[in-house]
Amino acid sequence: MSQLMQLKDVAESTRLGPLSGEVSAGEILHLVGPNGAGKSTLLARMAGLTSGEGSIRFGGAPLEAWATATLAQHRAYLAQQQNPPFAMPVWHYLTLHQPDKTRTGQLNEVADMLGLGDKLGRSVNQLSGGEWQRVRLAAVVLQIHPDANPVGQLLLLDEPMNSLDVAQQNALDRVLHHLCQAGIAIVMSSHDLNHTLRHAHKAWLLKRGKLIACGRREEVLTPSYLAQAYGLRFRRLDVEGHPTLISAT
């Protein structure tokens, strides 16, 4: 896998770092750690929305050198929370995020994959929390989907599983896996350690803005490292062939 983004001594006030790491094309990287660990701060910095100490290079160039419009063609970012902007149909909201507005087939395909096919005519301000979250996810997927955007490279997601039920989480995992196979790098924050253990290629474990461990998921999500991050004892068991983490009291 080729390196897509390099972070060196990235820090932001007392909330983050300094930390260094790399993101490769076609990999799924999970940011894990307790509340206040700095996951959202790091994602916003990687998206180019904030500034601070250290340096980030994206696609071989300093992140701050990218023009905003050009950067939006290469990376998409889902914030943790966002209210509907104003009343508009779901299909209209999704179209605003498409680089090629004529590709209605791509819009319908992504909407169907996320269970939104029957909601395209609904107004975004009349959706449930879970429905709105899936609309937001569909929008950022369409923004960098390789079938419609040949320069899409990076998808940054802040707690994308919020408000999704088990079936909807599974549907999102399938979409992300498809993007990963197409070469898109995905960086997302997660509070579900077992989900990370099954679906991430790599993980960064943070606590109070510091990077405790980074690397392959099974090397990072160990009882020893997790105890440092969460102050709890953990055990890793094998359940029907799947490694599973439980907190040990």
Swiss-Prot record:
<keyword id="KW-0997">Cell inner membrane</keyword>
<dbReference type="InterPro" id="IPR050153">
    <property type="entry name" value="Metal_Ion_Import_ABC"/>
</dbReference>
<feature type="domain" description="ABC transporter">
    <location>
        <begin position="1"/>
        <end position="233"/>
    </location>
</feature>
<keyword id="KW-1278">Translocase</keyword>
<comment type="subunit">
    <text>The complex is composed of two ATP-binding proteins (BtuD), two transmembrane proteins (BtuC) and a solute-binding protein (BtuF).</text>
</comment>
<dbReference type="GO" id="GO:0005524">
    <property type="term" value="F:ATP binding"/>
</dbReference>
<comment type="similarity">
    <text>Belongs to the ABC transporter superfamily. Vitamin B12 importer (TC 3.A.1.13.1) family.</text>
</comment>
<dbReference type="Pfam" id="PF00005">
    <property type="entry name" value="ABC_tran"/>
</dbReference>
<keyword id="KW-0067">ATP-binding</keyword>
<feature type="binding site">
    <location>
        <begin position="33"/>
        <end position="40"/>
    </location>
    <ligand>
        <name>ATP</name>
    </ligand>
</feature>
<dbReference type="InterPro" id="IPR003439">
    <property type="entry name" value="ABC_transporter-like_ATP-bd"/>
</dbReference>
<dbReference type="InterPro" id="IPR003593">
    <property type="entry name" value="AAA+_ATPase"/>
</dbReference>
<dbReference type="InterPro" id="IPR027417">
    <property type="entry name" value="P-loop_NTPase"/>
</dbReference>
<dbReference type="InterPro" id="IPR023693">
    <property type="entry name" value="ABC_transptr_BtuD"/>
</dbReference>
<keyword id="KW-0547">Nucleotide-binding</keyword>
<dbReference type="GO" id="GO:0015420">
    <property type="term" value="F:ABC-type vitamin B12 transporter activity"/>
</dbReference>
<keyword id="KW-0472">Membrane</keyword>
<dbReference type="GO" id="GO:0005886">
    <property type="term" value="C:plasma membrane"/>
</dbReference>
<keyword id="KW-1003">Cell membrane</keyword>
<keyword id="KW-0813">Transport</keyword>
<dbReference type="InterPro" id="IPR017871">
    <property type="entry name" value="ABC_transporter-like_CS"/>
</dbReference>
<comment type="function">
    <text>Part of the ABC transporter complex BtuCDF involved in vitamin B12 import. Responsible for energy coupling to the transport system.</text>
</comment>
<protein>
    <recommendedName>
        <fullName>Vitamin B12 import ATP-binding protein BtuD</fullName>
        <ecNumber>7.6.2.8</ecNumber>
    </recommendedName>
</protein>
<dbReference type="GO" id="GO:0016887">
    <property type="term" value="F:ATP hydrolysis activity"/>
</dbReference>
